[in-house]
Amino acid sequence: AHLHALYLVHHEVWRPLAAAYQHQLDRPIVPHPFRLGDTVWVRRHQTNNLQPRWKAPYTVLLTTPTALKVDGIAAWIHAAHVKAATTPPAGTASGPTWKVQRSQNPLKIRLTRGAP
């Protein structure tokens, strides 16, 4: 009796549910933009104070429509937890330059930041 009731509910619910999700099946799947050999940053989910949010940079070894396998990390990583690592043009500094000024005291130095 219970199995027959379950069968009836299944037939009553399945068709409207399938019709409700049909529009999602008709949409084309848009894969992530990452390809083999790309360099990517991987999101660090648990960060401590002053720790960067992104672990950097890893090379993409394998891809699926939703995940990436990168060199140096054993687990697959969802594409939403990755961003492309851009490399600065050759000969340019990626950040600010620092200048060291020494003082009379050998244990003291002064660091000043210059323009990038």
UniProtKB/Swiss-Prot annotation:
InterPro entries per the UniProt record, alphabetical: MLVIN_C
Q: What is this protein called?
A: Pol polyprotein
Which is an annotated GO molecular function term of this record? Answer: endonuclease activity
Q: What else is known?
A: The Rauscher and Friend erythroleukemia viruses contain two components. The spleen focus-forming virus (SFFV) is replication defective, and causes foci of proliferating erythroid cells in spleens of infected mice. The second component is a replication competent murine leukemia virus (MuLV) that serves as a helper virus for SFFV.
Q: Name one GO biological process term.
A: DNA integration
Q: What is its EC number?
A: 2.7.7.-, 3.1.-.-
Which organism is this entry from? Answer: Rauscher spleen focus-forming virus
Presence of the UniProt keyword Nucleotidyltransferase in the record: yes
> What keywords appear on the UniProt entry?
DNA integration, Endonuclease, Hydrolase, Nuclease, Nucleotidyltransferase, Transferase, Viral genome integration, Virus entry into host cell
Question: Do the record's keywords include Hydrolase?
Answer: yes
**What's the gene?**
pol
Q: Name one Pfam family in it.
A: MLVIN_C
